[in-house]
Amino acid sequence: MQWKLNYREPAKEWIESLPLGNGEIGAMVSGGTRQETIELNLDTLWSGSQKQSEPYPDLPDWNHIRKLVFESRYNEAEEYAKSHILRDWTAAYLPVGTVDVQMLTENGNNEITEYKRELSLNDALHTVHWIEGGVTYQKETFVSMSDNVLVMKISTDSDSEVKVHVSLRSQMPCVCRKSENMLVFEANAPVYAAPNYYQCEEPIRYKENSGIKFGIMLKPVLKSGTIEKNENGLTIRTSDNFYIILIGKTDFDGCDNIIEFMSDILKCAEYKGYKQLKQNHLETYHSFFDRLDLHMGESDDYFEKTDTIQQMKAFEKGENTSEFATLLFHYARYLMICSSKPGTQAANLQGIWNNQMRAPWSSNYTVNINTEMNYWMAESCNLGDCHTALFELIDRTVKKGKITAQKLYGLEGWVSHHNIDIWGNSDPVGKYAQDGSPCQYALWPMSSAWLCRHMWEHYCYTLDGDFLKDRAYPVIREAVRFYLGYLTEYDGYLVTCPSTSPENCFLDRKGEKHSVTFASTMDISILKELFATYLQICKILKVDVLEKETEFALKKLPPFKIGHDGQLQEWYRDYRETDIHHRHVSHLYGLYPGNVIKETDQELKKACEISLNRRGSQGTGWCMVWKASLWARLKNGEKAFELLKNQVNLTHTTEVDMSGGGIYPNLFCAHPPFQIDGNFGFAAAISEMLLQSQNNDIELLPAIPEQWKRGQIKGIKARGGYTVDFSWKNGKVYYIKISALKEGNVIVRYNGQISRFFFKEGQNKVCLQKTGRK
């Protein structure tokens, strides 16, 4: 099956352009005919530097702020936190620049017909096709997964001369030169880029010989013809097909001479030639994309007959829901490969695609949900090696997080808060906030524990003992060490204080709005899971460092509580939310993505269901797919599907809207504005609806909606080291094949029955095969 996005006109704005990438180079291609723009990104182009931005003040008086909280003097606690604990903003992810490709036709008044642009998800290729003046034109563009260059081939079916002008531009001051039929520019990123919501006199600040150094090198490769240098770029004249090679590089990794580095890469790419570059790219990309295949629905030629906008509108009406949901699933896999290929940086708020110097929320790593949601799909969707980009970020954050723990808390271990950046900055931000309430998002020292969950998940899916011992264990151990020190006694329990439920606020008994309290349900859920995970690791690795202390602390954490409406309480006390429909459903972490609330916890599951119904079925793009996964965990496929359907709401707005979530014409998730987490979360929700696994127990179709009557999936992963293929019709599974990494027993639940199987290491086994299910 060929999965593609296809359109009948060029992009008019960024949210209509189509994304290409290889984890390091990102490109948004407009698909223009006479005027093409390719907006570029490099995964390591950020503001700031490795150096600490500001010195730490004296250690805050944590006993004082805890006293204020326990005495319900919340306003005073928040004021103290803002003035003594919060610090400067993180660095910002930045755009590199733009390639302009102009077709200089002799008669610009010719009618353009049979226009089509496509993004092949199977091949990671962008193509544009049109006819003008009796000549057929085609542009084929890819960002090589193997040779680390962007390549665009321009071809026609005519022997007539083609005249094309190519130029580069950037929003940052740069030095541009033309040499040896090439365009080269160099620049330095700003040392400071303020968030777009922070107003100041100098939001973008440069410092001579400071900031990340970066460059772009572009070269047309011709069989025949001429390349003319001019003030604005290069003008190409040729009667043959030709292609353009582009390479970008920063000195983030310590590269001493980025120009020499790019020149070597470009020469190597030119030597290989277009055919070899494309073949190498396809082989590498297919090694990721072809691991898994999902097909749902009845129509095999649906995507050939209709364009993407038509498909989206049909889905909104409840038509062809299986096919379009499957397309969005594969699009998420495509975006993961393109933005988080092993060896590159972790996908940020916008993956690797950003065209603004002051992007929404600095396009950083927001780790109170968004970054984590990016990777919920990674393991189950057979892209566990793409997950490793996040682990590299975690390793850098651990180093800074140890300093934060020591200087800000006076504790051992490591900690991070709701924002981090490429440098691993782990401090709570918001010191200079102008909204008056930064604590509701900033005073949350729990992301380090949540990030640990991802390392444990990687082990659960891969059973990689070396990874657990050498990589995950030290990180998780030091996080546990911090939280053991951070917990404090209250009411016979060990609680977090101060504590928030990310970005949400509550009303106290006087009806006043606050965010800072103690023992939020999310905090406690995360710590219950972290401590239980650490104890499991101790048993697996036969180590006992902090084991007794962790066992004691786990038992002393407060229990979950059920509130006034039967809902799972969001805070230790039964406060009312200021916004009952708030986008964050943080108190349900223990249900999903966590596994603290078990299948057998019927009372708590009912409380979670009530909480979800109270929150409603609308919200931001990422919020709706989180709720879909929560409903899937509750085995309610119809509710999960309702949320996915609500998320497919075509929008063009890029203004912040906390309840207007949807998707853009290029299928990017709209918060709005664009955030890529909703794309990845959509795939995670579908994965959870099709297969759930815990402790060598696999359930197939646990939350399948009525609309998805027929389908098959190959290559989906389950915890315990299993790879599963299965097919279904009318909600009933009729074929199952499982392969196992390690020897052991597994329970498989399907069609209301339970089967048990034993596997030898590396064994493949057909567990169910029924005929007559065509």
Stretch-by-stretch model annotation:
Residues E478-I537:
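Acidic/histidine-rich catalytic neighborhood
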Residues E319, W361-Y365, A378, D435-M446, ...:
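Alpha-helix capping and helix-loop boundary segments enriched in small/acidic/polar residues
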Residues D290, I337, G485-T488, Q536, ...:
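Charged/polar positions within long, soluble alpha-helices
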Residues W456-T462, F467, A472, A479-E489, ...:
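Non-catalytic carbohydrate-binding regions of carbohydrate-active enzymes
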Residues A346-N364, E489-E503, L667, L700-G711:
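Short, surface-exposed recognition loops and adjoining beta-strand edges that mediate ligand/DNA contacts
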Residues I369-E379, P445-W456, M522-A532, S586-N595, ...:
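Well-ordered alpha-helical segments within folded domains of soluble proteins
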Residues M1-C439, E457-Y459, R477-V480, L494, ...:
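Aromatic-residue-lined binding/catalytic grooves and analogous aromatic/hydrophobic interfacial grooves
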